[in-house]
Regions:
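Sec/Tat signal peptide C-region and signal peptidase I cleavage site
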Residues: 17-22
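Edge beta-strand at a domain terminus
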Residues: 81, 132-153
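Cleaved targeting-peptide boundary
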Residues: 23-28
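Bacterial N-terminal signal peptides
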Residues: 7-16
Length: 153
C-alpha cells in the first residue's frame, strides 16, 4: 500500500512539474491577412503572454498601407500598442486580447486608441484575425491569414 501511495505522489509531482515547465500560454503570429481570400488587406504582427485571471502582456501591430491600404483611409491606417488583458483556449486554438496604443491615420493624424483582437491559430486559409478599434470605435472586417502564421501554445 505504501508503494502505491508513493507511486501516486510521484506521478502527481511529475505532472505538476511538467505543467510548470510548460510555462504560460502564448499567442503569436505575423503575416498578411485577406478579407476576400486573395487580395492583401493588412500586415499584422503580435506576441501575447497570458497570465491568470485575465492578465496578459505583449504587443500588437496592424498596418493597412501600400498594397494593403484600407479603402477610405489611404494612404495609411495603423493600430499599434501594448496588450493589457486577454484570454486563451490552447485546446481550441483561439485567443482574445485587448490593449491600448495609437491609431495612426497618416495625414489625418494620430490618436489614442483601445483595441480588441480575436485570433484563431493557423496558416494561410485557416488562421483568423479580427481587429476592432474600441475607441474611437471602428470595426474592421475579420481577416483570414493570406501569408504567415498564427500560433497558440
Amino acid at each position: 500500500m505504501r508503494r502505491l501511495a508513493a507511486f501516486i505522489v510521484a506521478v502527481i509531482a511529475l505532472a505538476v512539474t511538467g505543467q510548470a515547465l510548460a510555462g504560460p500560454p502564448i499567442a503569436n503570429g505575423g503575416g498578411r491577412g485577406t478579407v476576400d481570400g486573395s487580395t492583401p488587406f493588412s500586415q499584422f504582427g503580435f506576441g501575447v503572454r497570458f497570465g491568470v485571471a485575465g492578465a496578459a502582456s505583449g504587443s500588437f501591430n496592424c498596418l493597412m498601407a501600400g498594397s494593403s491600404a484600407f479603402p477610405g483611409f489611404e494612404p495609411l491606417m495603423k493600430v499599434s500598442g501594448s496588450v493589457t488583458s486577454g484570454s486563451v483556449n490552447v485546446t481550441a486554438g483561439t485567443a482574445s486580447f485587448t490593449g491600448s496604443g495609437t491609431l495612426n491615420l497618416g495625414p489625418s493624424g494620430r490618436m489614442d486608441a483601445l483595441f480588441l483582437v480575436d485570433v484563431r491559430e493557423g496558416g494561410p486559409g485557416v488562421g483568423k484575425l479580427h481587429l476592432t478599434v474600441l475607441a474611437p470605435f471602428f470595426p474592421v472586417p475579420e481577416e483570414t491569414v493570406l501569408t504567415g502564421q498564427i500560433s497558440i501554445h
